[in-house]
């Protein structure tokens, strides 16, 4: 069925407002869905065809030959995906959040130092070290450690969501009771196992908080331990093939070579990721909007903000604004779709974050947004992984042997049964959702409706 004309859409929205009828009900009764809605500046398919193509991360060239990695603060697995697509091999993940662990397992990760088998608490590095040694991670680790300690205490964007009079408004940085010291806990683990290469990822605020003293001290500790630590650099993910503006701090060190940052690439417009249909993919539920909200959204121009809902329409001809996590306690948030006057689904945000379409997020929809928005874009991780291989491993022929690390990991029987029960439930829920069909399917939560 053809999408609404602008006048048809105005009519149905006005009727909903006058009758007090939910827009979703009116759309279903007319055999329509939110996908049929249009902006006032509706564009035809020729606009999409004119945009450059985007190459998914899982279709890119593999360069490394199975160099082993251990992932810390793994989250939803963005760094893992990028390194694996570049040819590295993840042999263990360390993660404290149960839902993130569920997502990792859902996507094939089986060796996870985290709930329900272990705490995965990096604020207790001695316990993490003991767990990793138990499964066979050796000292002088012949591979890569990578991770991004939680960044909320260093983030400017995170604190803009809080009331200025609240204690969360200021960037507490290294003074944060729970999150501020995790960088140094991670360094403790690095210094114990002495991997050949390490990568630290964080927000750009890491280099400016406390006048840069703490980040400089972190680099000094690693250099004193014999690592060649490249000067930390703030990079824009949009300069490395990610169709999104996202500023991140990258620190790489090696005891077997010198790391060179990858060359930048031409920026991709966000419209490129919408050239391929998304219908039928996992995590693609759209939020329920009122007729009043859609009436406001549909008159927005490219890149403009709806001040009442505090959401922005993406400009399809430019990189996306930063995909955000939406907080840990409130509802998940996303920007407005560039071509449809509604907020984006988790899958659409994941496309912009450069996750493969096959990658699945677990948990409530709001928490899926959290996982997606917190993640390192896999394409950015891929570019850094390729640069590590090119500048270090490809030049170190003498280090090309004995990189096979075998991990021995057998979770307790009771935990194995719990995991199987969870997986069965997820399969049943997924099948039930598929029976309903996708078009017109929405979710509604009081904390997220706009």
Q: How does the language model describe each region?
A:
Residues 43-45, 50-194, 204-206, 213:
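Core alpha/beta nucleotide-donor-binding catalytic domains of modification enzymes
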Residues 149-150, 195, 243, 356, ...:
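Proline-centered helix-kink/hinge sites
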Residues 95, 201, 348:
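Acidic-residue sensor for enzyme active/binding pockets
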Residues 1-43, 47, 55-60, 287-450:
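C-terminal target-recognition/interaction regions appended to catalytic cores
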Residues 130-144, 152, 156-316:
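Class I S-adenosyl-L-methionine
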């Amino acid at each position: 069925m053809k999408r609404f004309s602008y006048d048809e859409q105005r009519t149905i929205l006005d009727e909903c407002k006058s009758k007090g009828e939910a827009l979703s009900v009116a759309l279903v009764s007319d055999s329509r869905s939110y996908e049929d809605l249009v902006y006032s500046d509706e564009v035809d398919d020729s606009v999409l065809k004119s945009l450059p193509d985007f190459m998914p991360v899982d279709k890119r060239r593999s360069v490394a030959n199975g160099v082993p990695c251990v992932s810390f603060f793994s989250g939803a697995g963005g760094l893992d995906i990028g390194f694996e697509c570049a040819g590295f091999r993840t042999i263990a993940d360390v993660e404290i959040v149960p839902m993130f662990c569920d997502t990792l397992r859902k996507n094939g990760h089986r060796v996870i130092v985290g709930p329900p088998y272990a705490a995965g608490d990096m604020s207790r590095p001695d316990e993490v070290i003991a767990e990793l040694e138990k499964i066979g991670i050796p000292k002088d680790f012949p591979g890569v450690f990578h991770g991004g300690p939680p960044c909320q205490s260093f983030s400017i964007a995170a604190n803009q969501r809080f009331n200025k009079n609240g204690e969360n408004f200021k960037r507490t940085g290294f003074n944060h009771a729970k999150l501020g010291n995790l960088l140094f806990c991670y360094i403790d683990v690095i210094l114990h196992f002495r991997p050949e290469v390490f990568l630290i990822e964080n927000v750009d605020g890491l280099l400016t908080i406390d006048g840069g003293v703490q980040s400089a001290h972190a680099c000094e500790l690693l250099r004193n331990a014999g690592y060649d630590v490249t000067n930390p650099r703030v990079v824009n993910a949009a300069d490395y093939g990610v169709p999104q503006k996202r500023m991140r701090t990258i620190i790489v060190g090696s005891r077997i070579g010198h790391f060179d940052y990858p060359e930048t690439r031409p920026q991709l417009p966000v419209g490129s990721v919408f050239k391929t249909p998304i219908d039928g993919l996992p995590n693609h539920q759209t939020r329920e909007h009122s007729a009043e909200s859609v009436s406001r959204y549909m008159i927005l121009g490219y890149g403009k903000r709806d001040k009442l809902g505090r959401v922005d329409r993406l400009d399809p001809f430019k990189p996306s604004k930063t995909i955000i996590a939406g907080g840990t306690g409130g509802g998940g948030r996303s920007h407005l779709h560039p071509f449809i006057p509604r907020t984006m689904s988790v899958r659409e945000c994941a496309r912009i974050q450069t996750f493969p379409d096959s990658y699945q997020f677990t948990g409530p929809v709001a928490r899926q947004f959290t996982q997606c928005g917190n993640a390192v874009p896999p394409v950015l991780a891929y570019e850094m992984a390729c640069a590590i291989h090119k500048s270090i491993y490809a030049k170190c022929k003498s280090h090309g042997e004995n990189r096979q690390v075998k991990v021995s990991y057998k979770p307790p029987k009771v935990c194995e049964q719990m995991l199987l029960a969870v997986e069965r439930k997820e399969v049943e829920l997924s099948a039930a959702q598929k029976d309903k069909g996708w078009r017109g399917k929405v979710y509604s939560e009081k904390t997220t409706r706009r």
